Amino acid sequence: MSDEAARRVTFSFAAPVDNAAAWNLDLDVFANGLLQAFPGASATREGELGPHPSDALRIEIPLGGGAWLEGLVTMPYPKVGSVLALTASAAEAAVLARWIRDFYAPSPDLVYFTSDLALDQGATDYGQIPSSGDTQAIACVLQEHIDDMDE
């Protein structure tokens, strides 16, 4: 599933800014669901990270063909946090985004995203993951985001 030539960025997936606790984030529940959905995946507690103490969970998801997606789930406040797809192509990050949308978020319209590329450019608006559609549809939205930021 890995595309070596694809542009890689770090994507951040989260609940809507105006309803940050909408996912009711729980690292143990997240880890258990991820491990069940992706055989061979790993989820390891990292403890507190960053300037504001934040519980964290390091994740690795097998994508096939020897490719892996690395990620980090951080929870700086109870029930509130984000999920990072680290240095990923749009297609790779879409696998994680779809799982969050379809199996973790309580409603498919509660998954928003940004990227390190956007934040580096001062962009503060979050995009929304489509509330329906397959992994390819999500990958297209993420790739459009990268393309817009690269212009």
Predicted regions and their residues:
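Helix N-cap motif at beta-to-alpha junctions
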Residues: 20, 89-92
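Elongated alpha-helical scaffolds
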Residues: 92-98
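Short, extreme N-terminal segment that most often corresponds to the first beta-strand
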Residues: 1-42, 150-151
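Exposed regions on extracellular, virion, or secretory-pathway luminal proteins
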Residues: 64-65, 91-92, 104-107
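Acidic, proline/glycine-rich low-complexity IDRs
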Residues: 1-4, 98, 102-151
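Short, intrinsically disordered low-complexity segments
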Residues: 33-87
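Hydrophobic beta-strand segments of well-ordered beta-sheets in folded domains
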Residues: 8-11, 81-83, 111
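Extended, charge-rich low-complexity interaction segments
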Residues: 75-90, 141-151
